[in-house]
C-alpha cells in the first residue's frame, strides 16, 4: 500500500470513527428528545423512530446505487454535509414532523457514507488488504458506539440540544480529512469484464439475493441483541436486573470486537470462508443457548455474550467479502446498497421479540433466533453455490 493510499485509508477510518461517535451520542437520546421537547407518548415515539429509520434505509438504497455513477470522494463529502445539516437543523426547528424528516436524513446520509466507504475500499485496495481494512473499520464503529453514548449522557445532562451540536462538530473533521487526504476514485470501466452498469443487474443476480436475505436474518439475530436481551430479562426477572445484564453484555461485546476483530478478520479468505462462517454460526447458536441457561448468573451472561460475539466478529467481514467478490467492477456501491437492506432485520427485532415474549415461553425467543441464524447460514451457502466461489464475478 503506497503512501497516498495509506493516507486516504487512514483518513476514511478516522472519519468513520468520528461520524459514529456523533451518531452514538444522539441516537440513544432521540426518544428522550421527542418526549421532552414535543411531549410525545411512547407509542408515537416508536412510530416516529421506526419511520425515520426505515426511510433512511430505503432512500440510502437508491442513493447508494447512484454512487457508482459519480466520484466517490465527492459523494462522501455530500453525504457528510447532509449528515451535519440534519444535526444542525433539529435543535433549530420547532416542528415534530420536521424533526422526524431531518432524523431520517441523518440516517440516510450515514448509511450512504457507510455504503460508499465500503465501495471505495473495494475499488482501491488489494484483495489481501480489503478484509483487513474492513475489520479495522468495524472496530472503529464499535469504538464509536462505545464512546458516543456515555459522551451523549454527559452532554444531555447539561442541555438536551448539546449532543446534536457535538455530532455536527464531529462531522466537520471528516469533511476536512476527506477533502485533504482522500484521493479521487478512478473511474472503473466495467465493460472490460462484460458487465454494464445497470440496476437490472441487481435483480438478476441470484447470489446477491441469497446473500441479502442471509444478511437480513443475521442482522435480525445480532443487530439488536442488547435490546433483545433486555426485553427477555425484564420478562423473566425485572428492570433492575435487566440493567445489570446489559451493563455486563455490552462491555463484553465491545471489548471482544475491539481486541479480536482485526486478528480474526484478516484471516478470512476465499479458501476458508465457508469453514469460518460455519464456525461463526456455531458460535451464535452456542451463545444463544447459553443465554437460555444464564438465568440470574451475570457470569454466564458475560460468557455467553463472549461466545455470541465471536460469531459477530466472523460474520461482519465475511458478509463484506461475499458481496465484494460477486460485485462486478463499477457496481460495488450498488451491490453494497442492496446488501444494506439487510439492516432492516435489526430494525424489526424489538417488535418481533416483544410479540414472542408475550405469546410464547420466554426461552422460545433464543430458540427462534438460533433457528434464524442457521437459516441465514443455509442461505449464505446457497449464494456461494449460485456464484462459483474463487472465480471472477461475471454478469
Enumerate the language-model features and the residues they cover.
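Short amphipathic helix-loop junctions that connect adjacent transmembrane helices
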Residues: 29-43, 227-246
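A late C-terminal transmembrane helix in Major Facilitator Superfamily
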Residues: 330-359
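Helix-to-loop junctions at the C-terminal end of transmembrane segments
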Residues: 59-71, 260-273, 357
Amino acid at each position: 500500500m503506497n503512501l497516498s493510499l495509506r493516507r486516504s485509508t487512514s483518513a476514511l477510518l478516522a472519519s468513520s470513527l468520528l461520524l459514529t461517535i456523533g451518531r452514538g451520542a444522539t441516537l440513544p437520546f432521540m426518544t428522550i428528545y421527542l418526549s421532552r421537547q414535543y411531549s410525545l407518548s411512547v407509542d408515537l415515539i416508536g412510530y416516529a423512530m421506526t419511520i425515520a429509520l426505515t426511510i433512511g434505509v430505503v432512500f440510502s438504497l437508491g442513493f447508494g446505487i447512484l454512487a457508482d455513477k459519480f466520484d466517490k470522494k465527492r459523494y462522501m463529502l455530500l453525504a457528510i454535509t447532509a449528515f451535519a445539516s440534519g444535526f444542525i437543523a433539529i435543535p433549530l426547528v420547532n416542528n415534530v414532523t420536521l424533526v422526524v424528516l431531518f432524523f431520517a436524513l441523518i440516517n440516510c446520509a450515514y448509511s450512504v457514507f457507510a455504503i460508499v466507504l465500503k465501495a471505495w475500499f473495494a475499488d482501491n485496495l488489494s484483495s489481501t488488504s480489503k478484509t483487513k481494512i474492513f475489520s479495522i473499520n468495524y472496530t472503529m464503529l464499535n469504538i464509536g458506539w462505545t464512546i458516543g453514548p456515555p459522551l451523549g449522557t454527559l452532554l444531555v445532562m447539561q442541555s438536551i440540544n448539546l449532543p446534536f451540536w457535538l455530532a455536527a462538530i464531529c462531522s466537520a473533521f471528516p469533511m476536512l480529512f476527506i477533502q485533504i487526504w482522500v484521493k479521487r476514485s478512478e473511474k472503473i470501466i466495467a465493460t472490460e469484464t462484460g458487465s454494464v452498469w445497470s440496476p437490472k443487474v441487481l435483480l438478476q443476480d441470484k447470489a446477491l439475493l441469497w446473500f441479502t436475505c442471509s444478511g437480513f436474518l443475521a442482522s435480525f439475530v445480532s443487530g439488536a441483541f442488547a435490546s433483545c436481551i433486555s426485553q427477555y430479562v425484564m420478562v423473566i426477572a425485572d428492570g433492575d436486573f435487566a440493567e445489570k445484564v446489559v451493563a455486563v453484555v455490552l462491555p463484553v461485546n465491545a471489548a471482544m470486537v475491539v481486541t479480536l476483530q482485526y486478528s480474526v478478520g484478516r484471516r478470512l479468505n476465499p479458501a476458508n470462508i465457508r469453514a469460518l462462517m460455519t464456525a461463526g454460526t456455531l458460535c451464535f447458536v452456542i451463545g444463544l443457548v447459553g443465554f437460555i441457561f444464564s438465568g440470574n448468573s451475570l457470569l454466564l451472561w458475560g460468557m455467553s455474550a463472549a461466545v455470541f460475539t465471536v460469531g459477530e466478529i466472523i460474520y461482519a467481514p465475511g458478509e463484506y467479502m461475499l458481496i465484494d467478490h460477486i460485485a462486478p467492477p463499477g457496481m460495488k456501491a450498488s451491490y453494497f446498497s442492496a446488501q444494506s437492506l439487510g439492516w432492516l432485520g435489526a430494525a424489526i427485532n424489538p417488535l418481533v421479540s416483544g410479540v414472542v415474549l408475550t405469546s410464547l415461553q420466554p426461552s422460545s425467543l433464543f430458540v427462534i433466533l438460533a433457528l434464524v441464524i442457521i437459516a441465514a447460514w443455509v442461505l449464505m451457502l446457497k449464494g456461494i453455490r449460485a456464484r462459483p466461489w474463487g472465480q471472477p464475478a461475471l454478469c
